Amino acid sequence: MITKRERQRVAKPVVLIAEELSPATVGVLGSDFDIRHCDGANRDELLAALKSGVDAVLIRSATKMDAEAIGAATGLRVIARAGVGLDNVDIPAATAAKILVINAPTSNIVSAAEHAIALMMASARNIPAANASLRAGK
């Protein structure tokens, strides 16, 4: 078991948060990680942050982790996608670089179900037609 003193001497893993995440999500990381932020949609800023040496990067939809970004990342071990799809991650390039890619495939199940129920209720009550009539002044 690692003592508190030994843990303080060990460098914390560096996590790059490349897009805005909720404070609760960032809070989960706590003080166990060295957290850095960048604008993942800004290509130059992303590449510079990746070149600085990070262990993990947290992304959403706007950040493109293609072969160039993966190649620029020194020491990167994990690409974590806060969301369902992985279309913005070059999986073959990450695999070749031995980088673990993870996502949250069930993160929007409740929201999707709520939206489906709301659409069914709107359809049952003819809300789209009523809205159109109201806007037309009828």
Regions found by a protein language model. Give the residues of each.
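Phosphate-binding beta-alpha-beta segment of Rossmann-like dinucleotide-binding domains, i.e.
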Residues: 97, 105-138
